[in-house]
Amino acid sequence: MSYCKIEAPYPEAEAGEKRIIFALDPKGDEVEQEQCMLQLIPGRVLEMSRNDAANHQTLGGSIEQHTVEGFGAKFFHVKLAKQAVSTLMYVHAEDHGEKVRKFVAMSNAPMFPYRSRYPVVVYLPKDAELRYGIWCGGQQMQAATE
């Protein structure tokens, strides 16, 4: 079983960005390669009216995967749109101007291979937040036959 090593010379965060580093629990090489995926979900916590919060918001953006030369360690660079897009349903008759804070995620957050050998290193805008999901399946699915 492999364990997280922070040996690679990851680049420093650029101006206006921050670097987030976290480790994934080892699950065994076979399980990590065949059954698990990591989903990075960057976004921003935005203040909005109760009416707007009842609608579905999303941020445009992208996640680029890079490799630290000579180490094989991966890192990710996030670009996020400044403005969220939203559905426009009218929900509350009396909004009263109340403001709420809501996490708005990047649309179509991609999945990446689960690798506990190295830490997960993500560069994103300073005003952004990173959440993540770990997806693990069981045994391989089989096709149904007639």
UniProtKB/Swiss-Prot annotation:
Pfam families the record matches: Ecotin
GO molecular function: serine-type endopeptidase inhibitor activity
Matches recorded under InterPro entries: Ecotin_sf, Prot_inh_ecotin
Source taxon at top rank: Eukaryota
Similarity comment text for this entry: Belongs to the protease inhibitor I11 (ecotin) family.
PANTHER family for the chain: ECOTIN (PTHR35890:SF3), PTHR35890
Protein name as catalogued: Ecotin-like protein 1
Organism this protein belongs to: Leishmania major
Recorded name of the encoding gene: ISP1
